[in-house]
């Protein structure tokens, strides 16, 4: 937490900054006591207006009373520090509705690898992973899920451990290699 100048329970958002989802997250975070939000990332590829968007989101955070820290884009080599600073990771949805049910965001798997419980929307691919491995909460109500996880350290730890075990068994390069070798040998 010290690395980013934040305290309390930290809910992270890591990835391309999309205003609609961040507005939802800041609104939800403002309803949860002693919660800090770490927002890591830059503008989606090819989009301008990033500086103005950050300014607007920072103003919204102040207006709503959400304790938010925007880091801007950081190098990939710092992602381990970002995940380590998070007690919870919020996995936003894709803007393109056609992708929502099929895509598994890398940040979901990264959170599992770092033992961080996740909050995801009710979209098929990510919902199946989170429910199967009990490594987070599937919801459209960010505030309710943030409250539940921020108030229950034991639950956060259990979900984080569940995610880590599932990651090690199913999603490492070694696990994928074995699956591919099995496909080719059949």
List where the protein language model places each region.
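Conserved donor-binding/catalytic core segment of Leloir-type glycosyltransferases
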Residues: 5-20, 26-31, 37-40
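Nucleotide-activated donor-binding/catalytic signature segment of Leloir-type glycosyltransferases, i.e.
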Residues: 41, 51-81
């Amino acid at each position: 937490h010290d690395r980013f100048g934040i305290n309390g329970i930290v809910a992270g958002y890591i990835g391309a900054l999309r205003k609609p989802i961040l507005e939802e997250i800041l609104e939800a975070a403002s309803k949860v006591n002693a919660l800090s939000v770490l927002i890591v990332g830059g503008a989606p590829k090819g989009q301008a207006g990033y500086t103005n968007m950050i300014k607007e989101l920072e103003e919204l955070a102040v207006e709503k009373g959400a304790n938010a820290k925007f880091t801007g884009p950081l190098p990939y080599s710092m992602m381990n520090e970002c995940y380590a600073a998070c007690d919870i990771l919020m996995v936003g949805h894709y803007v393109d509705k056609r992708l929502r049910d099929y895509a598994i965001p890398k940040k979901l798997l990264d959170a599992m690898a770092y033992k961080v419980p996740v909050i995801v929307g009710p979209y098929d691919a990510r919902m199946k992973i989170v429910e199967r491995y009990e490594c987070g909460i599937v919801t459209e109500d960010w505030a309710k899920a943030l409250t539940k996880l921020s108030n229950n350290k034991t639950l956060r730890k259990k979900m984080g451990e569940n995610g880590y075990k599932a990651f090690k068994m199913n999603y490492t390069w070694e696990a994928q290699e074995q699956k591919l070798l099995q496909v080719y040998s059949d």
